Curated annotation (Swiss-Prot):
GO molecular function: methyltransferase activity
This protein's name: Methyltransferase cpsF
Biotechnology: Campesine G features good insecticidal activity against the global honeybee pest Galleria mellonella, which supports its future application in the development of biopesticides.
Pfam families: Methyltransf_23
Length: 283
C-alpha cells in the first residue's frame, strides 16, 4: 500500500475553500504569519485548488515581478506541466510530484515557501525540508501550518466523549499501519532546525469542534472551525479508516456517527490545535 496517508481527490475544491477560510480566520485575517516583505518569488506547495496562491497573487498584484508557483502533490506520470492561474497573471500552477527532485526550479531562488495541510501526505519530511531550504534565497522564509492529530479539552469534559476518543484511537492505529508518525506536526519545528532553518518559531491556536466557548475569538471562528473538523472526520473515515484498517462500512459509519454526536455536544468542550511554524534561511 502507498505510504502516503489520504490522497486528494477530484471534487475537493469545497474542502480546500473551507480549509483556506479556516486558516485565514485562525490567523486573524492574515494569509501568512511569516515576516515576509516584498517577495518576488513565492511557492505554495500542495496547493489543492490553489485558493491560497490565487488570493496571495491578487493581494500583491501591484508588486513587481511577483511569481507564485502552486504545486500539486501526487504521482504525476506525465512529468511536469505548467498553466496560468485563473485571472491572476502573476500566479502559475505546476502539476508535479513535490516529493521528487525539483529540477523545474533549478533557475530560480524563492523568497517565501508556504505549506499548509500536508502532514500525512508526505513520505519524508526531512527530504522535503532539505529541498525547501536549498530552493530558498538567503533571507527567504518557510511557513508550515497544519492541525494537531488529537482532540483536546482543558476541563476534563473530553473524558465523557467516548466517540471522539475512539475516533482518535483508530486514527492513530491507521497512521501506524501506514508508517506515519503520530503527532509528527508537533516535531516540525525541530525538523526545520535540523534542515538548517534559523529563527524557527511555533504558534498554536485552539480551534473548537463546536460553538461551546464563551471566548469571543473562539466563538467568531466556531462555525468555520466546526465545519472543517466535521469534513476532516468524514474524509478520514471514508478514505482512511475503512480502506487502511479494513473496517466494514457499517463499523466506520458507527464510529463516525458517535464521534460527530460528541462533536456537536456543547457540554463537551473539545478543540484541536492549529500549529504554524516559521523559519528563515540566513546564509
Amino acid at each position: 500500500m502507498d505510504k502516503a496517508l489520504i490522497s486528494h481527490q477530484e471534487g475537493d475544491q469545497l474542502y480546500d475553500e473551507l480549509c483556506h477560510a479556516f486558516f485565514v480566520r485562525s490567523n486573524n485575517g492574515k494569509l501568512h504569519l511569516a515576516p515576509v516583505e516584498r517577495p518576488k518569488c513565492v511557492l505554495d506547495l500542495g496547493c489543492g485548488a490553489g485558493v491560497w496562491a490565487t488570493e496571495f497573487g491578487e493581494r500583491l498584484s501591484d508588486r513587481e515581478i511577483l511569481w507564485t508557483w502552486a504545486l500539486k502533490t501526487g504521482n504525476c506520470s506525465q512529468g511536469v506541466s505548467f498553466m496560468s492561474g485563473p485571472d491572476v497573471p502573476n500566479c502559475q500552477f505546476i502539476a508535479a510530484d513535490i516529493q521528487n527532485e525539483w529540477t523545474w526550479l533549478a533557475q530560480h531562488k524563492v523568497d517565501f515557501i508556504h505549506i499548509r495541510g500536508l502532514v500525512g501526505f508526505i513520505h519524508s519530511w526531512p527530504d522535503l525540508l532539505r529541498r525547501v531550504h536549498a530552493s530558498l534565497a538567503p533571507g527567504g522564509w518557510l511557513e508550515i501550518a497544519d492541525l494537531g492529530p488529537h482532540t483536546l479539552s482543558d476541563d476534563g469534559s473530553l473524558s465523557q466523549a467516548q466517540g471522539l476518543l475512539q475516533f482518535d484511537k483508530l486514527s492513530d492505529k491507521m497512521l501506524g499501519t501506514m508508517g506515519q508518525q503520530v503527532g509528527l506536526v508537533t516535531r516540525l519545528g525541530d525538523m526545520m532546525e535540523t534542515a538548517g532553518f534559523q529563527d524557527v518559531s511555533e504558534s498554536t491556536r485552539k480551534t473548537p469542534l463546536s460553538d461551546w466557548s464563551d471566548d469571543v475569538e473562539m466563538r467568531q471562528m466556531a462555525s468555520t472551525s466546526a465545519a472543517l473538523h466535521e469534513m476532516d472526520f468524514r474524509m478520514i473515515a471514508s478514505r482512511g479508516l475503512q480502506p487502511v484498517l479494513n473496517l466494514s462500512s457499517e463499523k466506520v459509519e458507527h464510529v463516525l456517527s458517535d464521534a460527530l454526536h460528541d462533536m456537536h455536544n456543547k457540554r463537551i468542550h473539545a478543540y484541536k490545535l492549529r500549529y504554524t511554524f516559521t523559519g528563515c534561511k540566513r546564509d
